[in-house]
Amino acid sequence: MKIISKMLVGALALAVTNVYAAELMTKAEFEKVESQYEKIGDISTSNEMSTADAKEDLIKKADEKGADVLVLTSGQTDNKIHGTANIYKKK
């Protein structure tokens, strides 16, 4: 039973990491590969309760717009979390 439970947890973890295609990069990481991408827009999130929720929302929005990469440009925590990001598609 423990083996089945471990396999199920592993499968769920793999499924969760592959739900979204867009990759969140830091500005420093993106600067190394910037020439391979073109900017396709900006996205934002607001009124999220946790940083994990804000990150998930930004990645989901980037994926919906066909982005391959998103780079955070701002974030605030005035009782709730707000954030913005630039989104890029591979050339």
From Swiss-Prot:
Top-rank taxon of the source lineage equals Bacteria
Which key words tag this protein in UniProt?
Answer: Periplasm, Signal
Q: Which residues form the signal peptide?
A: 1-21
Q: Which GO terms describe its biological process?
A: response to radiation; response to stress
Subcellular localization is given as:
Periplasm
Listed GO cellular component terms? periplasmic space
Task: Indicate the principal place this protein occupies in or around the cell.
Answer: periplasm
Which Pfam families does the record match to this protein?
Answer: YdgH_BhsA-like
Family affiliation:
Belongs to the BhsA/McbA family.
* This protein's name: Uncharacterized protein YahO
Which species is the source of this protein? Escherichia coli (strain K12)
